[in-house]
Amino acid sequence: MPPKKANAAGPKKGQKTRKREKKNIPYGAAHIKSTFNNTIVTITDQQGNVIAWASSGHVGFKGSRKSTPFAAQLAAENAARKAQEHGVRKVDVFVMGPGSGRETAIRSLQAAGLEVGAISDVTPQPHNGCRPPKRRRV
């Protein structure tokens, strides 16, 4: 067996780390993907380049707790805080998916201090495409 590395987590001494540059982007878009298992909040600029992101799992929830509205709220607050460091003040919101964290994430973006412009649902709707999974019998 090969020997384990001593410090696998962080950069070594003398090694330069890339410092995250502060961008000044006043207007962006918040993409909220809310599935049955998780909620992912991504804040981008108008070209679609990612400024900040957070998810229920990234915030610290595991398993079925990731799909709760409270986890979505914390994820949205976390992403909004990171985006405000880059100067984002106003966002358009694009919501995708059937999950339980949709409305909560939008409300917490507003509560975090971001001004919400338009809200649009971009959930893909099949024109009778793939066969859905079979019904659960409990």
UniProtKB/Swiss-Prot annotation:
Swiss-Prot/TrEMBL keywords: Ribonucleoprotein, Ribosomal protein, RNA-binding, rRNA-binding
Listed Basic residues bias regions: 13-22
UniProt region (Disordered), positions on chain: 1-23
PANTHER family listed in its UniProt record: 40S RIBOSOMAL PROTEIN S14/30S RIBOSOMAL PROTEIN S11
Assembly, per entry: Part of the 30S ribosomal subunit. Interacts with proteins S7 and S18. Binds to IF-3.
Family: Belongs to the universal ribosomal protein uS11 family.
UniProt-recorded name of the protein: Small ribosomal subunit protein uS11
Protein source organism: Mycobacterium leprae (strain TN)
Gene: rpsK
